[in-house]
C-alpha cells in the first residue's frame, strides 16, 4: 500500500506443510526484492528507477528463494528440526530434502516440481494467445485446457477449479503474465550459477535462527 509496506500473504494447506513452506518462501522473495529497490529512499517512489525491472525479474527473486534456497539441502538440514518438533513423520533432514524435491505430475501449477513447471506455463500461454487472437471461444476453454493437460502432463482435471479457474490471473485481467514465471525460473537459475561460482555452493551455507515461534 506504500513504499515501506512489505507484508505478504501466503497459502496454508492443512496436512501439506511443504506447500505452505514453499509458498511463504516464494512470497518472501517478492517482499525482500521490494525492500531492496531504490524506491525505499522515497526519492524514487513511483518513478521507473524505483520500480522492479520487470515482473520476470520480480518472479526470479521469489523463485530463487522458493526453489534455490528453501529446496536446498542446507536449508533442509537447518530447518528440519521445526518439522520434527511438530510431529513430522520423516526421520531426518535427508528425507525432508528428498520429499520437498519429489518429481510428480499434477494438476496444480503452484504445486508443480521444477521439471514439469514449465509445461504448466506453456499450456496457459498457448491458450491465452488463442483467446486473444480470437481463435478460441472462452466457453471452449475448459475443454481445450483439459485436452492440453492430458497431452502434456497425462492428467485431466475433474472440475474447472482444478483446471482453467485455478489461477487468479485471467479473472484479474493479467493476460500475458504467465511467461514471467518461466523467464523468472531461468533468471533464478542464472543467479544461482553466478552466486555459486563467486562464493561457493548454496548447500554449504549455514542457516541460523531458523526456529518457529
Residue ranges and their predicted role:
Residues 1-11:
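Active-site-proximal, well-structured secondary-structure segments within enzyme catalytic domains
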Residues 173-193:
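C-terminal substrate/ligand-recognition segments
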Residues 208-213:
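Conserved small/polar residues in nucleotide/adenosyl-binding loops
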Residues 22-35, 62:
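Active-site recognition of the HExxH zinc-binding catalytic motif
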Residues 10-22:
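Short pre-active-site segment immediately N-terminal to the catalytic Zn-binding motif
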Residues 75-168, 172:
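Long, amphipathic alpha-helical stalk/connector segments used for oligomerization, subunit docking
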Residues 51-88:
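Post-HExxH zinc-binding segment in Zn-dependent metallohydrolases
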Residues 34-60:
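Post-HEXXH active-site segment of zinc metalloproteases
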Amino acid at each position: 500500500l506504500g513504499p515501506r509496506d512489505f507484508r505478504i500473504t501466503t497459502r496454508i494447506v492443512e496436512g501439506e506443510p511443504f506447500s505452505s513452506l514453499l509458498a511463504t518462501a516464494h512470497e518472501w522473495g517478492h517482499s525482500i526484492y521490494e525492500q531492496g529497490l531504490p524506491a525505499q529512499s522515497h526519492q524514487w517512489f513511483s518513478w521507473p528507477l524505483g520500480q522492479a525491472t520487470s515482473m520476470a525479474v520480480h518472479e526470479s527473486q521469489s523463485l530463487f528463494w522458493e526453489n534455490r534456497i528453501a529446496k536446498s539441502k542446507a536449508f533442509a538440514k537447518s530447518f528440519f528440526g521445526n518439522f520434527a518438533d511438530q510431529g513430522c513423520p520423516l526421520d531426518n533432514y535427508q528425507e525432508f530434502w528428498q520429499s520437498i524435491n519429489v518429481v510428480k505430475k499434477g494438476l496444480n501449477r503452484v504445486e508443480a516440481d521444477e521439471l514439469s513447471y514449465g509445461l504448466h506455463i506453456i499450456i496457459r500461454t498457448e491458450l491465452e494467445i488463442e483467446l486473444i487472437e480470437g481463435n478460441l471461444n472462452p466457453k471452449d476453454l475448459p475443454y481445450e485446457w483439459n485436452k492440453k493437460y492430458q497431452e502434456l502432463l497425462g492428467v485431466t482435471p475433474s472440475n474447472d477449479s482444478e483446471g482453467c479457474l485455478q489461477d487468479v490471473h485471467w479473472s484479474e485481467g493479467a493476460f500475458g503474465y504467465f511467461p514471467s514465471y518461466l523467464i523468472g525460473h531461468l533468471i533464478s537459475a542464472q543467479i544461482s550459477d553466478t552466486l555459486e561460482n563467486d562464493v561457493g555452493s548454496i548447500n554449504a551455507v549455514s542457516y541460523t535462527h531458523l526456529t518457529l515461534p
